[in-house]
Amino acid sequence: PEALSGETYTLTAENGLLDGLRTYPVGGVVLFGQNVSTREQVQKLTDDMQAAALAHRGIGLLIVGQEEGGQVSVLHEKLGDTPEASAGKLGKSGDASQVRNAAAATASYLLELGFNMNIAVSADVLSSESGTDIGDRSFSGDPATVAEMACAAEAAYREGGVIPAVMHFPGHGGVEGS
């Protein structure tokens, strides 16, 4: 829509969102780059959304972001923070503890901003180094390495209080484009 209107839109509690949360049985909200302007705005938005959902339904919301590390780190980019390394870089290390540490740091970052779910971990097995959208979003082209690293990341997110939404399986594969 902003490409058509020339407008960018930052979601705030004043945009009718809270009325919607108080009226409808919403289970979750996904926030993207256009919903983010400052750390304070994001924290207020997520706090206000949780309060509205709790008041209406008695249970909180899933508040979802997508922070994979590397090139897919919307919040880090918008807020001027440095993201964790990409899955590809971490996978090349062969060290699952580095993956756990990166996922734990991302979980802490997300919780601080009010997110409790992350559209990550990519469990895709890289089919080629080029010609695919996945690229460094995959831990490896080796299924065993991907499984080990994805499980390490998934566990670290859960231990850190963030629900990981594991994606790209059975695989994005060698598809060109999303």
Predicted segments, located by residue:
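Substrate-gating cap/lid alpha-helix
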Residues: 149-150
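Enzymes and membrane/adaptor proteins characterized by extended Gly/Ser/Thr/Asp/Glu-rich
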Residues: 7, 20-146, 173-178
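Boundary/entry segment of secreted carbohydrate-active catalytic domains
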Residues: 1-13
